[in-house]
């Protein structure tokens, strides 16, 4: 996969490059972030304008490092970044979103239901990472204190 940079090509080109077959789903997710994500305080009110560059495209570099068929935990998933982006860009990767707060889990479940397809595998677990009784090949955490 060619390594395209957000500042050198159009948003549509990047979406087509990194989300083949998932274009509608990633756009639906971006809409969720800008709408319900801001309303529920999962992302800041000024983040809507930069949702693609600062949040979605920022999650893409790791997708090129994951081997085919890997499993991944996204700890403290919050609004689903980077876990949902990884799942949509790499449908072969099984992604588990781990989040302790109920309101965030509700948001994640709504997003997963809205973007789900037979091509992607995303599981949402309410809990703390140390309490999860499963394992994964890789772990991500973004803005976790």
Region annotations inferred by a language model:
Residues 1-69, 73, 103-106, 110-118:
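Class I SAM-dependent transferase core
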Residues 144-145:
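Short beta->alpha connector loops
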Residues 60-141:
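Conserved SAM/SAH cofactor-binding pocket of Class I
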């Amino acid at each position: 996969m060619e390594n395209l940079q957000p500042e050198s090509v159009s948003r549509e080109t990047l979406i087509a490059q990194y989300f083949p077959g998932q274009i509608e789903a990633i756009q639906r997710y971006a809409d969720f972030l800008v709408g319900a994500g801001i309303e529920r305080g999962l992302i800041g009110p000024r983040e809507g304008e930069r949702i693609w560059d600062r949040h979605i495209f920022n999650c893409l570099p790791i997708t090129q490092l994951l081997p085919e068929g890997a499993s991944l935990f996204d700890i403290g998933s919050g609004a689903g970044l980077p876990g949902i982006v990884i799942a949509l860009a790499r449908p072969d990767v099984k992604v588990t979103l781990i989040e302790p707060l109920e309101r965030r889990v509700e948001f994640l479940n709504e997003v997963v239901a809205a973007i789900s397809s037979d091509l992607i595998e995303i599981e949402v677990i309410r809990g703390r990472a140390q309490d999860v009784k499963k394992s994964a090949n890789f772990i991500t955490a973004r803005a976790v204190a």
